[in-house]
Amino acid sequence: MLPQTALLLLMSLNLVHGVFYTERYQTPTGIKGPPSNTKTQFFIPYAIKGKGVSLRGEQGIPGPPGPAGPRGHPGPSGPPGKPGTGSPGPQGQPGLPGPPGPSATGKPGLPGLPGKQGERGLNGPKGDIGPAGLPGPRGPPGPPGIPGPAGISVPGKPGPQGPTGEPGPRGFPGEKGTSGVPGLNGQKGEMGHCTPCRPGERGLPGPQGPTGPPGPPGVGKRGENGLPGQPGLKGDQGVPGERGAAGPSGPQGPPGEQGPEGIGKPGAPGIPGQPGIPGMKGQPGAPGTAGLPGAPGFGKPGLPGLKGQRGPVGLPGSPGAKGEQGPAGHPGEAGLPGPSGNMGPQGPKGIPGNPGLPGPKGEMGPVGPAGNPGAKGERGSSGLDGKPGYPGEPGLNGPKGNPGLPGPKGDPGIAGSPGLPGPVGPAGAKGVPGHNGEAGPRGVPGIPGTRGPIGPPGIPGFPGSKGDVGTPGPPGPAGIAVKGLNGPTGPPGPPGPRGNAGEPGLPGPPGPPGPPGQVALPEDFVKAGQRPFVSANQGVTGMPVSAFTVILSKAYPAIGTPIPFDKILYNKQQHYDPRTGIFTCKIPGIYYFSYHIHVKGTHAWVGLYKNGTPVMYTYDEYIKGYLDQASGSAVIDLTENDQVWLQLPNAGSNGLYSPEYVHSSFSGFLVAPM
């Protein structure tokens, strides 16, 4: 019923106006997206024309809007409209909650984002003390710290006495002492009475008999030639000898070949002759021909002319060829400060500068709790062998050893007739020394036999029991000096009296460099009555000193080895070796090292090494036609026998340049001992 009523209303409007207003219902515009699927939209796809005569009259006044008709049935859905471009509408109110759906076990969802950090809760009650934790693993070494400020030098308390040093090398043997005066013979005792008498104990050895007269000279065979001796030292140049007398002239030699034709020299001018008699005046001669033009004359310089007017400015000349780079000039005097220029634009961010000087020392913080003992660190690698030390001073002479125990005296043997010398037999066991027999008559000297081969050494005998101390005997003949085994070092004896000065020996080889001398101080530097001792290894404040500055005298050193800076400006402590280019630490502490190099020809890459490990690198990219500079510095802690040097690690970047007047240098000094 409702659709029919709407259709009749539309037909009546068409009859009045003659034209049917075609209305198309479109989807709402302004919202992007797919066409709406609502079922309330419809459209009429064709126009309905009225029947009869259409009279077009004037348009009347639009009437008031009629009452809204009842809601019609939803028409069929029209075709989708063009997508709109409107702005999204306001968000609708949330709909009523739908009925609960059937429950089903869903898949676990993705983990949600972490929530916001909650507020800090109240502190809980203090828990019981837990068990002590195990020491954690040893952490990696931290970066080297910034050097602290120079401390105030205060003389410290004397440290405890160090351990006793190792015993020094055995000293030279002392001079042989003089033999003691033999004692007086005691009084002869009374004759003893005994029945049957036991043989008495062995008496003391008697004094050595007087030396017999020398025998006739023996006839021995000529010995073998000895080994050639060592070449003697070169003697001093002798005094030039006197000039010898002239020798007699030799016989006349054969005539020589004819020499080339000589060119005679003009002789000396002759003595002028006496003036002749003046002659008669002759007839005037015919005029001669014109002579040759004379030599150009040299007139005296005339007076300087007036100053001429300034000429026009000449054209600029063509640029000359590029000259060779001259040597670096001496730094000129500082010029007058120029006027301040206008504020320029902000430049690009510069390279970060070197770390600044350390700030003032902060106040001492509270002492923290004692930490747990850390795990024992791994043993470090053994350092490089140090240079051999200088020879120590000779030790004091040890005390003279006790005299050896005299062996038991052997029984006297029966003197036999002298036999022919036989071959040398094997050495027998050592016999008991016999009593000194009475001097027999001198026998006929025998013929000296040939020298036999050296026999094998005998079996050493058992040590005898200690006998009584014998009376000092007369000095024996001088023995053969053989160096014995070094005995244990005895305690130092008291210094002996000064001996007589010996004869001057041969000049020895040059010794190692001696310790540096003392530093002289000006008179006004020292207070009255005070003379502080300052050595090369100790500064004015009493702290130890270790410093050096060296220069490289040759450009382009070798690759992969320490750079030998061989020209020394300061190296009194001898801690830097100019032959190897290595600085060896003798005083453990904190050191400061710096280097300044010039670069020419190619790039330069320099490394500062400590015990074979690079500490830092410096690189300079060379620009052709320029002389570049590069520098670097570092603070390093060193222990004894640590070594530091500079090295070129790459063969492609070896442009280290150091000629005669453009120096590359390397310096280092001790900041604070540890």
Swiss-Prot record:
Disulfide bonds: C194-C197
Changes after translation: Hydroxylation on proline residues within the sequence motif, GXPG, is most likely to be 4-hydroxy as this fits the requirement for 4-hydroxylation in vertebrates.
Domain of life where this protein originates: Eukaryota
PROSITE patterns recorded: C1Q
Region annotation Disordered: where it falls in the sequence: 54-521
Subcellular compartments: Secreted, Extracellular space, Extracellular matrix
Binding site for Ca(2+) 2: D628
Record flagged with keyword Transmembrane: no
Residues modified as 4-hydroxyproline: P460, P463
Protein name: Collagen alpha-1(X) chain
Source organism of this protein record: Bos taurus
Chain's gene name: COL10A1
